[in-house]
Amino acid sequence: MDTVPKVTVLIPTKNGGAIFAKVLEHVVAQHTPWPFEVLVIDSGSSDNTIDICRRYPEVRLHTIPSNEFGHGRTRNLGVSMARSEFVALITQDALPLNEHWLAAMVAAIEPDPAIAGVFGRHIAYPDANPFTTHELELHFAGFDAWQVVQMDDPERYTRDQGYRQVLHFFSDNNAVIRRSVWEKLPYPDVDFAEDQIWAQKIIEAGYKKAYARDAVVVHSHNYELFERLQRSFDEAYAFRRLFGYVLCPSPWALVSSWAALTRRDLAYARRSRLLGTQTKAVLMAPFDNFMRLAGHYLGARGDRLPGRLRQRLSRDKRLMLGLGAAGGKAEK
């Protein structure tokens, strides 16, 4: 009789390539005091992703047609197939930093049945832009003061957008959810931000959310300028439609935010003496910041744009339609 696992590690894939091979190697090598299983759901890989999975007899592989993939839908399928109390969610390019990643994540959620989900820290790949590395450090350091949260002030939750954002931030690039809660509150079937919508649902239902600083994955992207605009467009368009947030409310906000971000980056470059070692990154930082904010400005007004232009500006939509990189799989 098979041993029932405590955790299922769920990895959606499409054309994961060499980095996925390394991710899977690190996942199956996790050291835990309890059994776990690995479930890969592939949506039409044309590279060697399937062969990589078959190197590991213990890995469960399930395939679906590419047109059936959806960020929320595919994760719901995987969780429904899990045999475990907890489901760990990572992506094909999120590399566990060490062999204690999974145990650290579960240790943060298991003791309190009111905790519905926990997310872990991201750090950048060694080849990442230094400003990406710094921004990830700042972003996740902000959660050190919010290790376990729940909605303890409904009035503040209603009026304070920043408080709401802290409570519903979640990243299923690196997370564990409690399956019994998912059975009541599954993922939404959406193209973007399915993890944050789910976190909003569990917070509003009275559950807690946790942050596991020691459960670390290496995960970052090196975007070209237009890719940065597209990614930011997707973020702002989704946040306007799903949460009502306007990430860049006016041209003046664009200019003032650009100036603030650029001053921050140049100050960091001076402190870290990057001009001599990362000259291109330093020179490109103001342009990258502008494209990010331009994407936020356009995305917040996405419903006013013609459909063809909206599709052109959406990186996620083009990847899902097979018009961009990453083998047509929408990235996270």
What is each model feature region?
Residues M1-H26:
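N-proximal low-complexity "stem/linker" segments adjacent to membrane-targeting elements
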Residues E25-P35:
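Short, acidic, metal-binding catalytic loop of nucleotide-sugar glycosyltransferases
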Residues D42-I50, A94-L95:
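A conserved acidic beta->alpha catalytic loop
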Residues P65-A82, Q92, A104:
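Glycine-rich, basic loop-to-helix element that forms the pyrophosphate-binding segment
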Residues V87:
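Short aromatic/hydrophobic "clamp" motif used to bind/position activated sugar donors
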Residues L95, E99-H139:
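Conserved donor NDP-sugar-binding/catalytic core segment of glycosyltransferases
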Residues P154-I177, F239, F243:
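A recurrent flexible, glycine/aromatic-enriched loop bordering the glycosyltransferase active site
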Residues D234, C248-K332:
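Non-catalytic, C-terminal membrane-associated alpha-helical segments of glycosyltransferases
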